[in-house]
Design a protein with these regions (language model features):
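Class I SAM-binding transferase module
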Residues: 2-62, 66-326, 330-359
Length: 359
């Protein structure tokens, strides 16, 4: 079981910022997402491989973007698809849908899902690509949950259905040398001032699997049929055992796995790994954004430890550490994310802690 320490109260639906919405109208952003074949193929394969689930059904696409998921659903036989987006990209989606001959099946609506008036009372399926960096940065999950509670039939299906989140410590002296130690001597000059922010802000990078110095720990599962808004801020316990000796622990990385299950009764173990799901012959579709698989546009969230303040200790294989991981939302930016970690090696007396911003 994944142990929960506490879940701070968080019940209001976050509102997207205008800069965030303007970014979503740019073609290059959508090109990047569509060319992420791990992401797009997973949605396509689940929908096309389960046409019987979509045939004759009413589908709601929350945050439809270019309309690609709505088009998949219509082509799979959905009788009606309602595509909703709060940015100007909806005009492009409407044109894409018309050009592909699905205007009679897909209805496009611009506005917040909480404010638009749908032409139906209930839907059979909600499909959405809402995930952000570290899963919840600039994510639309608040709105998807609202749509589920308002529009999804009791027997309805969420696509995707489950998210498993992972954390593990990393040791990457090459990255530290290139991006942190570099500034200490630039052609003989001290430019440490340029390091500002690199250990304060989470980085979005695709890390080599070789940088992992422990087995990943599954710290959170979201079951989209049941998750509530207050579940999106949390503190979780985690632990790890070093699988190799290291000169210093340089940080942590966070990623998520997505699961698409054909029935709301289907369960996904909290420690299920997406990269092993299909190989094990499990039903549904799964993909990972982790470092041991093909890169996705989400990459991983990298939290570098500020080892300048205190010289880190070398560690031996087999040493164990544990701590807490916290996600919170800053009051002044509802789309931002603050990640806080605490950690302590069993051999140490002192616990360490650090926070990182994603904004």
């Amino acid at each position: 079981m994944i142990a929960t320490i506490s879940a701070p109260t968080h019940t209001t639906v976050r509102s997207p910022s205008q800069p965030h919405l303007s970014l979503l109208t740019r073609s290059d952003i959508h090109e990047t997402m569509l060319k992420d074949t791990i992401r797009t193929d997973a949605y396509r394969d689940f929908i096309y491989n389960h046409k019987s689930l979509f045939a004759g059904k009413t589908v709601l696409d929350v945050g439809c973007g270019t309309g690609i998921l709505s088009l998949f659903c219509a082509k799979a036989g959905a009788s009606r698809v309602i595509a909703v987006d709060n940015s100007a990209i909806i005009d492009k989606a409407r044109e894409n849908i018309f050009n592909n001959g699905f205007s009679s099946t897909i209805t496009c609506l611009r506005g917040k899902i909480e404010e638009v008036v749908l032409p139906v009372e209930k839907v059979d399926i909600i499909v959405s690509e809402w995930m952000g960096y570290c899963l919840l940065y600039e994510a639309m999950l608040d709105s998807v949950i609202w749509a589920r509670d308002r529009y999804l039939k009791p027997e309805g299906l969420m696509v995707p259905s489950h998210m498993n989140m992972w954390v593990t410590p990393i040791a990457d002296p090459d990255y530290v040398a290139d991006h942190i130690a570099f500034w200490r001597d630039v052609y003989g000059f001290d430019m440490k001032a340029m390091q500002a922010g690199i250990v304060d802000d989470a980085q979005v990078l695709n890390m080599p699997a070789s940088t992992l110095c422990a087995e990943p720990f599954p710290f959170l599962q979201l079951s989209l049929h049941e998750t509530t808004v207050k579940d999106l801020v949390f503190k979780k316990k985690w632990n790890a055992k070093l699988t190799t000796g290291i000169d210093a622990m340089d940080g942590f990385i966070i990623w998520f796995d997505s699961f698409f299950m054909p029935s709301r009764e289907d369960e996904v173990p909290e420690d299920a790994k997406a990269e092993e799901w299909g190989k094990a012959g499990k039903k549904g579709i799964a993909f990972t954004t982790g470092p041991k698989a093909k890169e996705t546009h989400w990459k991983q969230g990298v939290m570098l430890i500020d080892n300048v303040k205190e010289k880190p200790l070398s560690r031996k294989e087999g040493e164990q550490l544990s701590g807490e991981l916290e996600y919170s939302v800053p009051e002044d930016n509802s789309r931002a994310l603050k990640v806080r970690m605490t950690w302590k090696f069993d051999e140490d007396e002192k616990e360490s802690s650090q926070s990182w911003n994603m904004k």
